[in-house]
């Protein structure tokens, strides 16, 4: 006799019974993301988690039932930017009864103080608490609270991407690790993201395989310091394992600390064509004296040794960097050394900012405490930044102009903002506006493009 129990059938509705009510429409969540690629990835994970609980992503805050502000605390005025955005969403809360939550690094930094300062924020949570977001949303319907505790590394669970949400996209972020164990004098990340925790390599590889199965062709492995990855293998080994995933054509990663750049990683750039010829290697300053105060654990000569080994291993590699100008005690000679390094390295791009003291950092504590820690006047720092940016614009323009007439491979990501154009990137991560329609250049396709125009920060071309 079969063990199967037949399913009972619901009786047919009698004549005149009311029709069943339609399913309630999904609630909507709007996410305002500030800052880095880690935050972009975290925002996607939050939307995916809520999607399993009947939430859909809203196109604007005006139609949202839940507004999430995922914040960044790396630069100055982070708190002011958050408060300005919160002010704009206050009316939506009053009109729709929407919940408002603040996550990310400012949330981790401010904790309960943010709830006291902004009475219409319903809850605050730090990066370690993302996996609990659905239950926090329900809890917020009855109370205001802050969840900013750290999880032990053994307990931490990396939110896994929903591959189906990436269907139709050419690229995706994959989290390899979180946190940072370095204590750079200017950086708040160890205070807002916690200690380093590496994701086990089988999980990283499995997520890349799932993404490849729905059409993703490029993955970017992300973490605050991926060079120190330790999820059961080295970072160089992890790159090789991801490169073996069928369907993944391109691999990128960010961010790296020069001190942790290994010879094995350089060899991956030499040997593995799927690892793209682009490396973001933040230097911060061209002065050894400033680097020592920054606690960067390398000299300019050591940085350039790693830089030159990358260039030798992968000729034509595009190397980008970060600079901080006006760090406490920076002299004219220190700044000129940064300019000289920029000219020598000819970075593809540099993300450069005036120093701003961040809470709890060594630089904030020691600012003004000794002659070598004296603040640089704001007007002096701004003038230095303008000179550095001008030099970088010139160098970037020269690099892009050298691409004119060349045929390059472009991975198409989707439509451009301009009608009749598609948007994509070269292996070196240069943005290309391609004159073509979707049929000729669908998302995920790698197409040959002849470069016909070089702008200040991007290229344009036609199918070759």
UniProtKB/Swiss-Prot annotation:
Enzyme class: transferase
Molecular function GO labels: 4 iron, 4 sulfur cluster binding; metal ion binding; N6-isopentenyladenosine methylthiotransferase activity
CDD domains in UniProt: Radical_SAM (cd01335)
Binding site for [4Fe-4S] cluster 2: 180, 184, 187
Listed cofactors: [4Fe-4S] cluster
Swiss-Prot/TrEMBL catalytic activity: N(6)-dimethylallyladenosine(37) in tRNA + (sulfur carrier)-SH + AH2 + 2 S-adenosyl-L-methionine = 2-methylsulfanyl-N(6)-dimethylallyladenosine(37) in tRNA + (sulfur carrier)-H + 5'-deoxyadenosine + L-methionine + A + S-adenosyl-L-homocysteine + 2 H(+)
Cellular component per GO, a single term: cytosol
Radical SAM core domain mapped to chain residues: 166-398
Domain MTTase N-terminal: 27-142
Region (Disordered): 1-25
EC number per UniProt: 2.8.4.3
Cofactor binding note from Swiss-Prot or TrEMBL: Binds 2 [4Fe-4S] clusters. One cluster is coordinated with 3 cysteines and an exchangeable S-adenosyl-L-methionine.
SMART domains assigned to the protein according to its UniProt record, in alphabetical order: Elp3 (SM00729)
Domain TRAM: 401-464
Swiss-Prot/TrEMBL keywords: 4Fe-4S, Cytoplasm, Iron, Iron-sulfur, Metal-binding, S-adenosyl-L-methionine, Transferase, tRNA processing
Alphabetical list of Gene3D superfamilies matching this protein: Methylthiotransferase, N-terminal domain (3.40.50.12160), tm_1862 like domain (3.80.30.20)
Annotated residues for binding of [4Fe-4S] cluster 1: 36, 72, 105
Signal peptide: none
Complex and partners: Monomer.
Family: Belongs to the methylthiotransferase family. MiaB subfamily.
NCBIfam families on file: miaB-methiolase, MiaB/RimO family radical SAM methylthiotransferase
Function (record text): Catalyzes the methylthiolation of N6-(dimethylallyl)adenosine (i(6)A), leading to the formation of 2-methylthio-N6-(dimethylallyl)adenosine (ms(2)i(6)A) at position 37 in tRNAs that read codons beginning with uridine.
PANTHER family for this protein: CDK5 REGULATORY SUBUNIT-ASSOCIATED PROTEIN 1 (PTHR43020), MITOCHONDRIAL TRNA METHYLTHIOTRANSFERASE CDK5RAP1 (PTHR43020:SF2)
Protein name per Swiss-Prot or TrEMBL: tRNA-2-methylthio-N(6)-dimethylallyladenosine synthase
Origin species: Anaeromyxobacter dehalogenans (strain 2CP-C)
Lineage: Bacteria, Pseudomonadati, Myxococcota, Myxococcia, Myxococcales
